[in-house]
A protein has these predicted regions:
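Alpha-helical adaptor scaffolds
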Residues: 72-78, 82-91, 95, 109-110, ...
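Ankyrin-repeat boundary/"N-cap" motif
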Residues: 5-14, 38-45, 72-80, 107-113, ...
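Ankyrin repeat structural motif
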Residues: 21-29, 53-64, 89-98, 123-132, ...
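Ankyrin-repeat-protein effector appendages
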Residues: 1-12, 100, 134, 143-144, ...
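Ankyrin repeat A-helix N-terminal signature
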Residues: 15-20, 48-55, 83-90, 117-124, ...
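Intrinsically disordered, low-complexity regulatory segments in ankyrin-centric signaling systems
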Residues: 1-31, 39-43, 47, 64, ...
Length: 170
């Protein structure tokens, strides 16, 4: 029985990344897959879906099944919103996580917020705009004292620097 659950959990972790149909995810959960299962890096289905899957419906199905929106992976202490801000090309994923109660200004182990991660790494400016629209702290600093605007300058994100300055960032 344990081997069967382990197999279901692996399928759920994979489906979180690739599924485009909610019924696929719901079927695995109905069979007994653990919504809190972790892969070898400590990532849960909600974290993987936030990072790699642009299907908001899959994300919502995981949330409805009880996924922990605030849980952070063990190495970098990044949660689902951090992971989405870092790599997702979908502002709808960001909006869905925020609507579900994700902490907009939560920090990872370096003190980076979702906005810092998006400004530094995500080429999709609509993701950054979604975080700003939601009220992300434009003057947040990581634990070394680097600000959002400094990250934007270092990443050569001229448009973002201009937008942040217009909003009063320093």
């Amino acid at each position: 029985m344990a081997k069967n659950i382990e197999s279901l959990n692996k399928k759920l972790l994979a489906a979180a990344i690739t599924a485009t149909k909610v019924k696929d995810v719901k079927a695995l959960l109905a069979e007994g897959a653990d919504i809190h299962a972790q892969n070898e890096w400590g990532l849960t289905p909600i974290m993987l879906a936030s990072q790699y899957n642009s299907s908001v419906n899959v994300l919502k199905a995981l949330l409805e099944a009880g996924a922990d929106i605030q849980e952070a992976e063990p190495k970098y202490r990044s949660n689902a919103l951090h992971l989405a801000a870092n790599t997702s090309s979908s502002p709808k994923v960001i909006a869905t996580l925020l609507e579900a109660g994700a902490d907009l200004n939560a920090r990872n182990y370096l003190g980076e917020t979702a906005l810092i991660l998006a400004v530094n790494s995500n080429e999709e400016t609509r993701v950054i705009s979604e975080l700003l629209k939601a009220g992300a702290d434009i003057n947040a600093r990581d634990y070394q004292g680097h600000s959002v605007i400094e990250y934007a300058k270092a990443a050569k994100r001229t448009y973002i620097v201009t937008q942040l300055k217009k909003m009063g960032a320093h």
